């Protein structure tokens, strides 16, 4: 039986990726369709994609597949053929090509089987995920933005919205998609007779969100085909005004794609205009936050003086302090006042 997981350290894998000379293309795609045996599907795709030197992150579940990957340019067409030929439901699936790509988005292939490809918290057996809203193409999106009867809803997390969004789009304040769905229904009650336009990064969240809105009685629901990535690409190709302002946050090493020159966010430490996300350099923290170059130098890439001080301690003492400390997925949120008292950083819960 072949080894169907990685046995090489992250450090070595990253070094190998950085040493590559062939350009890579960053691609994202998703598809809601029934997978009878996600584990067997995962193993078969692992072997096919490993043979093409694909890196990235792929989730599979009974409800479908969600993938963000990078592929060597010389293997893109072979990858497309392998994917399209793997299952009838994947034949012709839309591939979102990254807009602002240095080819260094991933350095390892990780494939996991999950309960859902997007954690939605929906347990209503009458919910029909296929009853989605209508797709909008780039020109139609711009027309809707000028329609006073239309309301745009951003179905991304607060840290994504903070650095970029469509003009006048409403933010659903939440840290997870699971928490956003009921909030969106609640917030949109006063707009129930309006045209509801939902969007996200690549389409996977807003597609399910549009079905959830329809499930809750909203009839005039649209969502942007291919999300922000496809909208910006098509608008540029067609010579249309790009009405997304700022940066599109992405979940890979790039942490963002520049859509417009506007910088609408601010450094979380000094307040200077900045939209560059980073993770705190303290291994016991890794808080996701926005930091300008001046503060990066001042705090040595850390989110606080406390983290900077901890970084200067002997490694053994740092490990002792990290032991037992909750870590991972910490996100700066200006709307919360509670702090992690150990480090003096915002609590992610």
From Swiss-Prot:
Keywords per UniProt: Oxidoreductase, tRNA processing
Q: Which domain of life is it from?
A: Bacteria
CDD domains, alphabetized: RHOD_YceA (cd01518)
- The molecule here is called tRNA uridine(34) hydroxylase
InterPro entries reported for this sequence: Rhodanese-like_dom, Rhodanese-like_dom_sf, Rhodanese_C, TrhO, TRHO_N
Q: Which Pfam families does the record cross-reference, listed alphabetically?
A: Rhodanese (PF00581), Rhodanese_C (PF12368), UPF0176_N (PF17773)
Q: Source species, please?
A: Cronobacter sakazakii (strain ATCC BAA-894) (Enterobacter sakazakii)
Single Gene Ontology MF annotation = oxidoreductase activity, acting on paired donors, with incorporation or reduction of molecular oxygen
Composition bias, Basic and acidic residues: 314-328
Active site, UniProt feature: 200
């Amino acid at each position: 039986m072949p080894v169907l997981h990685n046995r090489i350290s992250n450090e070595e894998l990253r070094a190998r990726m950085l040493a590559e000379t062939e350009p890579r293309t960053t691609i994202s795609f998703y598809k809601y369709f029934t997978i009878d045996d996600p584990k067997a599907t995962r193993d078969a795709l692992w072997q096919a994609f490993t043979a093409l030197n694909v890196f990235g992150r792929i989730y599979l579940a009974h409800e479908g597949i969600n993938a963000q990957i990078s592929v060597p340019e010389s293997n893109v067409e072979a990858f497309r053929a392998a994917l399209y030929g793997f299952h009838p439901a994947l034949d012709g699936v839309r591939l979102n090509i990254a807009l602002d790509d240095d080819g260094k988005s991933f350095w390892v292939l990780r494939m996991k089987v999950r309960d859902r490809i997007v954690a939605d918290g929906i347990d209503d057996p009458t919910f029909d995920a296929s009853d989605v809203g209508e797709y909008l193409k780039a020109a139609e999106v711009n027309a809707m933005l000028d329609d006073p009867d239309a309301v745009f809803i951003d179905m991304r997390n607060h840290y994504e919205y903070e650095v970029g969004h469509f003009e006048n789009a409403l933010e659903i304040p939440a840290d997870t998609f699971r928490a956003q769905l009921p909030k969106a229904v609640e917030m949109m009650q006063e707009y129930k007779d309006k045209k509801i336009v939902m969007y996200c990064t690549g389409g996977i969240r807003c597609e399910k969100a549009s079905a959830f809105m329809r499930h809750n009685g909203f009839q005039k629901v649209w969502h942007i085909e291919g999300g922000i990535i496809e909208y910006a690409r098509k608008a540029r190709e067609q010579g249309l005004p790009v009405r997304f302002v700022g940066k599109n946050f992405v979940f890979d090493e790039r942490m963002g794609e520049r859509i417009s020159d506007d910088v609408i966010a601010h450094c979380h430490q000094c307040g200077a205009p900045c939209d560059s996300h980073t993770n705190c350099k303290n291994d016991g923290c890794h808080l996701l936050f926005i930091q300008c170059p001046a503060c990066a130098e001042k705090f040595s890439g850390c989110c606080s003086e406390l983290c900077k001080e901890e970084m200067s301690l002997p490694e053994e003492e740092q490990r002792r302090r990290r032991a037992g400390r909750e870590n991972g997925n910490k996100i700066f949120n200006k709307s919360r006042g509670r702090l992690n008292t150990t480090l003096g950083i915002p609590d992610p819960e």
